């Protein structure tokens, strides 16, 4: 059980919500603030004075006053008219994160929503009744309206859900969770719809995947150093301290730890090779820059996870209703775009190391890492696959946040495109997982070919993990299953856990 304290969510909590089947509860300490906010809205609605989002239309229709006897219909119509998403359903971890983030935002007490609505979201979550939310349809301002409308429609008994992974009607989902359809009161529909929770959930889910891939890439990169008989001197701490970037310093320390005790390294310590290619030698510089970006993005997303991104905002102490723009997801878009660049670079650097390993001139290994070259093609086309994926990622890494299209009759004339920025991270991460799988296979092959000299104790664990599923490549065979099984192990964090470096979300 994870207790959600609104405004104080942590990255470890969010990773567990995404990756484990934990249940959640709202911190009782938040109840008073929630109740004050709801009462403030009820008081404003009772007075009848125009207040945006409470008794007016929305967006371009904000100047339209809504009579008191139509306020419940207004909220219902808002939810139904905004549920216009298209595409495949959001993944289960993303929906779980989205619901938890929405609860945290509402729980700060500035959205004016009743506790009964929030209790219903908690009940759905804990019963594993998750709204079916189409993944496309948000531009990241005014909030993630369409995705959150699909979540909210379920509270009304409308739409579809997944009950323990099986698709069903929202009405059936409510029954399983022990709930009846809700009637939303003044502002509650808007409070549910307005916010950055969809884009932030997508970005967080992919952040955790990219963190795992980063750790895996440290392992595969270190293994490639030994496979190519590379030097460990470029990882000397003194070099990196002189530059001063925290990520570079930490990455270099990870490579030193992973390669410590390598007999392969000792075997060529006195060779006449002066410098390794950049894909080996500059790993701390490149991976360090990636690490800094990943850490920065994690910090931005944690702030957003704890933010109140509703509009308008209720300030119960003064009774004020303030319209602003906290729904604009530009911080999320920038964080996701930075993650895309970092993840694409992780894959691009790994692809270069694969190219190095199969090149006999550079690596000193048999051409394409296989004996009897000519009859056998070895890793020749596996590298082509890695190159194709790395190239695809370069296009996917183009920033989404530099685009904007005006919406809502030009009332919402600049948007963030944060949801797309966050959504395409999944494609980038999947490509990187496959590139790293190919590198792990190629590096393991190279290390085998360095026998009788062995790699380091730390990297021998990686070798055992690979060889438990895939044998040494002696002769050409149907290669795709080898890549698939190692890629699956990459996704399962089998290699990430071998890295000495970890992230805040894993603490």
Swiss-Prot record:
One of its GO terms (cellular component) is cytoplasm. It comes from the Bacteria. Its EC number is 4.3.1.3. The keyword Lyase applies. GO terms for biological process: L-histidine catabolic process to glutamate and formamide; L-histidine catabolic process to glutamate and formate. Gene3D superfamilies: Fumarase/aspartase (Central domain) (1.20.200.10), Fumarase/aspartase (N-terminal domain) (1.10.275.10). Pfam families: Lyase_aromatic. It catalyses: L-histidine = trans-urocanate + NH4(+). SUPFAM superfamilies: L-aspartase-like. Pathway: Amino-acid degradation; L-histidine degradation into L-glutamate; N-formimidoyl-L-glutamate from L-histidine: step 1/3. The keyword Lyase applies. Belongs to the PAL/histidase family. HAMAP family: His_ammonia_lyase. This is Histidine ammonia-lyase.
């Amino acid at each position: 059980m994870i207790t959600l304290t609104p405004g104080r969510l942590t990255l470890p909590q969010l990773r567990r919500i995404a990756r484990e089947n934990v249940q959640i509860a709202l911190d009782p300490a938040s109840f008073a603030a929630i109740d004050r906010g709801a009462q403030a809205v009820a008081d404003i609605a009772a007075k009848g004075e125009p207040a945006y989002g409470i008794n007016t239309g929305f967006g371009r229709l904000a100047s339209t006053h809504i009579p008191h006897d139509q306020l419940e219909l207004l909220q219902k119509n808002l939810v139904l008219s905004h549920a216009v998403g298209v595409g495949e359903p959001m993944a289960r971890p993303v929906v779980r994160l989205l619901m938890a983030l929405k609860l945290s935002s509402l729980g700060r007490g500035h959205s004016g929503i009743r506790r009964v609505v929030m209790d219903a979201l908690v009940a759905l979550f804990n019963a594993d009744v998750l709204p079916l939310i189409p993944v496309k349809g948000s531009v990241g301002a005014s909030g993630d309206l369409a995705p959150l409308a699909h979540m909210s429609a379920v509270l009304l008994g409308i739409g579809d859900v997944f009950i323990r992974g099986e698709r069903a009607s929202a009405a059936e989902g409510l029954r399983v969770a022990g709930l009846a359809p809700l009637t939303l009161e003044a502002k509650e529909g808007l409070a549910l719809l307005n916010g950055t929770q969809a884009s932030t959930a997508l970005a967080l889910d992919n952040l955790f995947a990219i963190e795992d891939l980063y750790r895996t890439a440290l392992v595969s990169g270190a293994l490639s150093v030994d496979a190519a008989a590379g030097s460990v001197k470029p990882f000397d701490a003194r070099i990196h301290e002189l530059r001063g970037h925290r990520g570079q310093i930490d990455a270099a320390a990870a490579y030193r730890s992973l390669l410590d005790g390598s007999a392969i390294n000792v075997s060529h310590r006195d060779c006449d090779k002066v410098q390794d290619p950049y894909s080996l030698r500059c790993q701390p510089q490149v991976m360090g820059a990636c690490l800094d970006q990943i850490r920065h993005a994690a910090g931005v997303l944690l702030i957003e996870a704890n933010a109140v991104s509703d509009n308008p905002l209720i300030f119960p102490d003064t009774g004020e209703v303030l319209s602003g723009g906290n729904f604009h997801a530009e911080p999320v878009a920038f964080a996701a775009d930075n993650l895309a660049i970092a993840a694409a670079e992780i894959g691009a650097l790994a692809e270069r190391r694969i190219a190095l390993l199969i090149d006999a001139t550079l690596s000193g290994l048999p051409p394409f890492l296989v004996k009897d070259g000519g009859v056998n093609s070895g890793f020749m086309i596996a590298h082509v696959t890695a190159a194709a994926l790395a190239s695809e990622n370069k296009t996917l890494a183009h920033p989404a946040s530099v685009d904007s299209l005006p919406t809502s009759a030009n009332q919402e004339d600049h948007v963030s495109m944060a949801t797309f920025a966050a959504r395409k991270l999944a494609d980038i991460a999947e490509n990187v997982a496959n590139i790293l799988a190919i590198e792990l296979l190629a590096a393991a092959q190279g290390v085998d070919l360095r026998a009788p000299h062995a790699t380091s104790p730390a990297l021998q664990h990686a070798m055992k993990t690979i060889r438990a599923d895939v044998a040494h490549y002696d002769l050409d065979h149907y290669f795709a299953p080898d890549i698939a099984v190692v890629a699956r192990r990459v996704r399962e964090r089998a290699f990430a856990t071998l890295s000495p470096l970890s992230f805040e979300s894993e603490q």
